[in-house]
């Protein structure tokens, strides 16, 4: 991989060097934009957005093919809003990202993009996303805007650097993707839409606290008051188990989705709770945090994909 510090702004293509090509520079540029947008976060959240869309179609008694344009607008809008929020997060955190191993290669740290460029890209993505959501229903656009405000202002600009409650605040914004998806089809928001929201809300603290445990020294160096940094691992474990325990009955409230869903949700939930409780006896806290982190990713993916499958 080329480790050159040469800027890859399109205006600097000529200066890229004799061994570079326009295609190489463009490829790097697109990769950098994907890093700014936090592609992994956007992709995983689009799964939950699609689940919200599909379930709304099912429970409004309409036909999937009638909503193809709405689905495209909703997915594109949600993706852009999330990408915009993540890009703005990169812009705001550019002064501390160099202190953390997992963020030190972001384009805002390496200088591949100027701060002004990143700010403009983030604002443009967010604005376009809200416009696309508005083409579905006003409710979807409002929810997207609220989620964006919570993530960028209340989380990134305020609580992330000031309180251990940052994870809870961020969980509100992280829980809106399925709500956006449902609202794009049905602005009235069925009870099931809110249950999807609460599942996402309760899932996020144990997921991100596991990450915080894994990266505790990096967060400490960056001065970010994550719970493991401020209160230690034991308190963090207790809070993680509380959220996992609360998530189990909420996920089972969707028992009308059928026996297969109910059984799988119960097994997934009990398994995660058992792993959480096992953490109080494991000697290697970091290993346990890794297991919890991986389990959380599998839990979310399996649960939301299953919600769609059982309704085919």
Curated annotation (Swiss-Prot):
Q: Which residues lie on this side of the membrane: Cytoplasmic?
A: 1-36, 89-110, 158-228, 276-296
Q: Which pathway does it serve?
A: Porphyrin-containing compound metabolism; heme O biosynthesis; heme O from protoheme: step 1/1
Question: Which loops or segments lie on the Extracellular side of the membrane, by the record?
Answer: 56-69, 130-138, 248-259, 308-312
Query: Matching Pfam families, A to Z?
Result: UbiA (PF01040)
Write down the Gene3D superfamilies for this protein, in alphabetical order.
UbiA prenyltransferase
Its Gene Ontology molecular function terms? protoheme IX farnesyltransferase activity
Q: Please tell me which top-level EC class this enzyme sits in.
A: transferase
Q: Which reaction does it catalyse?
A: heme b + (2E,6E)-farnesyl diphosphate + H2O = Fe(II)-heme o + diphosphate
GO BP: heme O biosynthetic process
Q: What is its EC number?
A: 2.5.1.141
Q: Which HAMAP family match?
A: CyoE_CtaB
Q: What does this protein do?
A: Converts protoheme IX and farnesyl diphosphate to heme O.
**Annotated protein name in UniProt:** Protoheme IX farnesyltransferase
The protein's gene is named ctaB
């Amino acid at each position: 991989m080329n480790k050159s510090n040469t800027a890859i702004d399109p205006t600097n293509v000529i200066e890229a060097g004799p061994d570079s090509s326009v295609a190489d520079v463009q490829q790097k540029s697109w990769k950098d934009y994907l890093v700014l947008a936090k592609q992994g976060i956007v992709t995983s959240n689009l799964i939950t957005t699609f689940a919200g869309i599909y379930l709304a179609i099912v429970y409004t008694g309409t036909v999937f093919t009638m909503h193809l344009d709405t689905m495209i607008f909703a997915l594109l809008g949600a993706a852009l809003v999330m990408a915009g929020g993540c890009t703005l997060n990169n812009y705001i955190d550019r002064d501390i990202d160099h202190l953390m191993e997992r963020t030190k290669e972001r384009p805002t740290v390496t200088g591949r993009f100027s701060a002004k460029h990143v700010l403009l890209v983030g604002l443009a993505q967010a604005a376009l996303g809200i416009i696309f959501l508005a083409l579905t229903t006003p409710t979807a656009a409002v929810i997207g805007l609220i989620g964006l405000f919570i993530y960028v202002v209340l989380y990134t600009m305020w609580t992330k650097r000031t309180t251990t409650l940052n994870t809870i605040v961020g969980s509100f914004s992280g829980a809106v993707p399925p709500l956006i998806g449902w609202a794009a089809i049905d602005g009235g928001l069925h009870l099931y839409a809110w249950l999807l929201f609460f599942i996402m809300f309760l899932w996020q603290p144990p997921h991100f606290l596991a990450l915080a445990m894994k990266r505790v020294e990096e967060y400490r160096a960056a001065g970010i008051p994550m719970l493991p940094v401020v209160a230690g691992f034991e308190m963090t474990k207790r809070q993680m188990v509380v959220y996992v325990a609360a998530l189990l009955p909420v996920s089972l409230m969707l028992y009308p989705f059928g026996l297969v869903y109910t059984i799988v949700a119960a097994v997934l939930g009990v398994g995660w709770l058992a792993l959480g409780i096992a953490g109080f006896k494991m000697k290697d806290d970091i290993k346990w945090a890794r297991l919890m982190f991986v389990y959380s990713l599998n839990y979310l993916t399996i649960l939301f994909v299953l919600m769609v499958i059982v309704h085919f």
